[in-house]
């Protein structure tokens, strides 16, 4: 058996991988084991009771985390005229249309989120091969293709995250940083879980929230007692 590193050994002493922890305790343990020299992200993995092979059971959407993400988000907006002015007023970092498309084609992508007004999709649609693989392609399902670009910009800046099930039916998301308080992380997690519950596909059968675990970038992971989510 391979010898554990000092960090891994310390984590193994604190977190029992076979145990289900109440959500507050799980988050506290993950924070305690996030000892890297940078502010580690706190992540969550949620196993949903869906069939990921069926398109009508895929779960995708977005939610604004009440305590934010702890990250400064740069937002690019495809808009023109009054919508472009509204996007700038809302705090968008880059606003344009054909000029923005040319920047992206040239590999200049100094942004984290792309928002588009519906009337610009004729231009944005041609960028799918560039934006798609990076998870940046605007999509109405997550609120990034919308006539109300100003609200979309404000949401992105306020800590909106996007989520979608992977091939195994698992949602992966970041709910904050190790520097956040447990209550902040708990509130963010509650907002995500609430959004997932509301996005439950009609075709999904049986238990919907199957498993949930929280972890940090370099630290340990703790499994969460599902019942404790509704007890808080």
Swiss-Prot record:
InterPro entries: Ribosom_uL1_bac-type (IPR005878), Ribosomal_uL1 (IPR002143), Ribosomal_uL1-like (IPR023674), Ribosomal_uL1/biogenesis (IPR028364), Ribosomal_uL1_3-a/b-sand (IPR016095), Ribosomal_uL1_CS (IPR023673)
Gene3D superfamilies: 3.30.190.20, 3.40.50.790
MF annotations from Gene Ontology: rRNA binding; structural constituent of ribosome; tRNA binding
UniProt entry tagged with the keyword Repressor: yes
Gene Ontology cellular-component annotations: cytosolic large ribosomal subunit
Listed SUPFAM superfamilies: Ribosomal protein L1
GO BP of this protein: regulation of translation; translation
Record CDD domains: Ribosomal_L1
Family annotation (Pfam families): Ribosomal_L1
HAMAP family assigned to the protein according to its UniProt record, in alphabetical order: Ribosomal_uL1_B
Quaternary structure and partners: Part of the 50S ribosomal subunit.
Family as reported in the entry's similarity comment: Belongs to the universal ribosomal protein uL1 family.
Chain's role: Binds directly to 23S rRNA. The L1 stalk is quite mobile in the ribosome, and is involved in E site tRNA release. Protein L1 is also a translational repressor protein, it controls the translation of the L11 operon by binding to its mRNA.
Protein name (record): Large ribosomal subunit protein uL1
Lineage: Bacteria, Pseudomonadati, Pseudomonadota, Betaproteobacteria, Burkholderiales
């Amino acid at each position: 058996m391979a010898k554990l590193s000092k960090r891994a050994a310390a984590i193994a002493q604190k977190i029992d991988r076979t145990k289900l922890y109440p959500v507050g305790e799980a988050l506290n343990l993950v924070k305690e084991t996030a000892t890297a020299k940078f502010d580690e992200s706190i992540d969550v993995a949620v196993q949903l009771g869906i069939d990921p092979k069926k398109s009508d059971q895929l779960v995708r959407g977005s939610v604004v985390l009440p305590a934010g993400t702890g990250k400064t988000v740069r937002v690019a907006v495809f808009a023109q005229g009054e919508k472009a002015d509204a996007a700038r007023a809302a705090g968008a970092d880059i606003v344009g249309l054909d000029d923005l498309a040319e920047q992206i084609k040239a590999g200049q992508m100094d942004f984290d989120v792309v928002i588009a007004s519906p009337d610009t999709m004729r231009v944005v649609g041609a960028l799918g091969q560039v934006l798609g693989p990076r998870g940046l392609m605007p999509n109405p399902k997550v609120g990034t293709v919308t006539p109300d670009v100003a609200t979309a910009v404000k949401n992105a800046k306020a800590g909106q995250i996007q989520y979608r099930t992977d091939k195994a039916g698992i949602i992966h998301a970041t709910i904050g940083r190790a520097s956040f308080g447990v209550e902040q992380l708990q509130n963010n997690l509650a907002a995500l879980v609430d959004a997932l519950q509301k996005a439950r596909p009609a075709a999904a059968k049986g238990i919907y929230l199957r498993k949930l675990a929280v972890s940090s970038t370099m630290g340990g992971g703790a499994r969460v007692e599902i019942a404790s989510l509704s007890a808080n």
